[in-house]
């Protein structure tokens, strides 16, 4: 299970090369190379779960509006994770290794501190069918399922854990 992730809310114009490189180093490189190095230890029935994000699939409804984060580089890193999941699942499936991801929406963590403002919380809740901010346990429960025998026929998937965002 790889849960590498940092975020930087910034417009396209405001991102620096350093921001971009740091996001990709943390969000893409840091899960890629440990998995590569550990592959010899993975046998049939092993599972790899990466953490993607709702940001890889949707854009904010009103970019630039107060409370709406702009995350183009972060979203690109999480899109890269979703691509890795598909490629790794195809390559490692022959060895009986499953590879999946979870794609959390807004989860109450330090990374979603924008929800601490009324505007940010309103933005987050406006996207979700279930009308609450997700909890870390919501994501952990899906990860536990993905590594269980109950998910033995699932590989190459990215499971949204987002309260029905953008339905």
Residue map of PLM features:
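Active-site helix of classical SDR
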Residues: 35, 77, 85
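C-terminal helical subdomain
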Residues: 82-83, 101, 123-154, 163
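Residue(s) in the substrate-gating loop at a strand-loop-helix junction
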Residues: 53
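Substrate-binding pocket helix/loop in short-chain dehydrogenase/reductase
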Residues: 11-12, 16-24, 62, 70, ...
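Amphipathic alpha-helical dimer-interface segment in Rossmann-like NAD(P)H-dependent oxidoreductases
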Residues: 26-46, 56, 89-90, 94, ...
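Short, small/polar-rich loop/turn modules that mediate ligand/substrate recognition or access, typified
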Residues: 93, 98, 154-156
């Amino acid at each position: 299970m790889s849960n590498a992730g940092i975020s930087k809310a910034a417009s396209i114009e405001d991102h620096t090369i350093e921001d971009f490189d740091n996001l990709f180093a943390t969000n893409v490189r840091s899960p890629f190379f440990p998995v590569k190095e550990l592959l010899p230890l993975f046998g049939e029935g092993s599972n790899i779960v990466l953490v993607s994000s709702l940001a890889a699939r949707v854009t904010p409804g009103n970019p630039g509006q107060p409370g709406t984060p702009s995350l183009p580089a972060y979203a690109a890193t999480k899109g890269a994770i979703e691509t890795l999941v598909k490629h790794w699942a195809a390559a490692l499936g022959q060895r009986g290794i499953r590879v999946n991801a979870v794609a959390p929406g807004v989860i109450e963590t330090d990374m979603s501190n924008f929800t601490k403002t009324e505007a940010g919380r309103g933005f987050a809740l406006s996207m979700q069918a279930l009308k609450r901010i997700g909890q870390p346990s919501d994501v952990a429960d899906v990860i536990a399922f993905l590594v269980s025998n109950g998910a033995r026929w699932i590989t190459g998937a990215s499971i949204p854990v987002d309260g029905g965002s953008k339905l």
